[in-house]
């Protein structure tokens, strides 16, 4: 306790920031912001852009903090997560709960004030889906945790779209579907090269419950499905040739990784595939944004 109290403000700030899983939060918020821009042919009002971004970030951070709290014993048993302040006991349970409550409350107020009630309630529902349904119920109980629980993690584009329009039309759900289908292969390649970690922690990830070969096959199958799903923005008319070209090229690389993992697996290859999957989603959504504003100029 004395060591906790004696830490510098900068160190404490870093520890609390770590609870929000900044890199994961950044990707989620990025997809939400893209959803905002795709929802309007012009520019997103600054009030909505700033308020929506801050509110979604705060509620996402609150959800990740609860995740760290619930999984602190599990995290302590895994090399990948043993460094987290919650796993090391550097932040107490009451402190994490208070931190999450403050972030969540400010985030909800920000969304209600600067966007609309629908965005606030959808984001709160996403918080519950991740922090409660996925973390408490699905992750420790079923190898399909990522498939089912991926619904909450796929919501950011819909949240961004709702922030601008007050509605969630079909095009927004296409973006949600892309992230939903992307989630299993993204996490399963991680679970493959971290399978010992998950096994030691007692988590029923797919490589632990069904074996490596089964997981490799499903990574390939889901990546094929993902390739098809990413064509939907073009087919629906939401996006044009710039996006289509990007989706095909990015998807071809992802498919190549999935095929190599299926045929000739190595932990090093899985690590590369995991890193690429993050780059893939970021570039795919960036392509949606570029296409959205380039399409009227290029006429394609």
From Swiss-Prot:
Gene3D superfamilies: UbiA prenyltransferase (1.10.357.140)
Chemical reaction(s) catalysed: heme b + (2E,6E)-farnesyl diphosphate + H2O = Fe(II)-heme o + diphosphate
Gene Ontology terms: biological process: heme O biosynthetic process
Domain of life: Bacteria
UniProt-annotated location(s): Cell inner membrane
Record's GO cellular component terms: plasma membrane
Role: Converts heme B (protoheme IX) to heme O by substitution of the vinyl group on carbon 2 of heme B porphyrin ring with a hydroxyethyl farnesyl side group.
Name of the protein: Protoheme IX farnesyltransferase
Source organism of this protein record: Burkholderia vietnamiensis (strain G4 / LMG 22486)
Gene: ctaB
């Amino acid at each position: 306790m004395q060591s906790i109290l004696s830490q510098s403000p900068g160190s404490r700030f870093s520890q609390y920031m770590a609870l929000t899983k900044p890199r994961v939060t950044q990707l989620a918020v990025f997809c939400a912001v893209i959803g905002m821009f795709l929802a309007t042919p012009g520019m997103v009002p600054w009030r909505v852009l700033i308020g929506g971004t801050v509110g979604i970030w705060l509620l996402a951070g609150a959800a990740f903090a609860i995740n760290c709290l619930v999984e602190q014993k599990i995290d302590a048993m895994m090399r990948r997560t043993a460094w987290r302040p919650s796993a090391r006991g550097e932040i107490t349970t009451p402190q994490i709960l208070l931190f999450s409550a403050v972030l969540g409350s400010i985030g909800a107020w920000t969304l209600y004030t600067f966007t609309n009630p629908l965005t606030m309630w959808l984001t709160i529902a996403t918080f519950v889906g991740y922090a409660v349904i996925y973390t408490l119920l699905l992750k420790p109980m079923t190898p399909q945790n990522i498939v089912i629980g991926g619904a909450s993690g796929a919501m950011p584009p819909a949240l961004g779209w709702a922030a601008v329009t007050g509605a969630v039309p079909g095009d927004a759900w296409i973006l949600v579907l892309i992230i939903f289908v992307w989630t299993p292969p993204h996490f399963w390649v991680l679970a493959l090269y971290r399978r010992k970690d998950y096994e030691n922690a007692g988590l029923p990830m797919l490589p632990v419950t069904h074996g490596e070969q089964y997981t490799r096959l499903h990574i390939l199958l889901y990546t094929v499905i993902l390739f098809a799903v990413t064509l939907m923005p073009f087919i629906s008319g939401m996006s044009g040739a710039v996006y289509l070209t990007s989706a095909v090229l990015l998807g071809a690389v992802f498919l190549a990784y999935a095929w190599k993992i299926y045929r000739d697996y190595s932990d090093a290859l899985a690590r590369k595939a995991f890193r690429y999957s993050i780059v893939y989603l970021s570039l795919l959504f960036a392509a949606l944004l570029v296409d959205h504003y380039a399409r009227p100029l290029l006429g394609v």
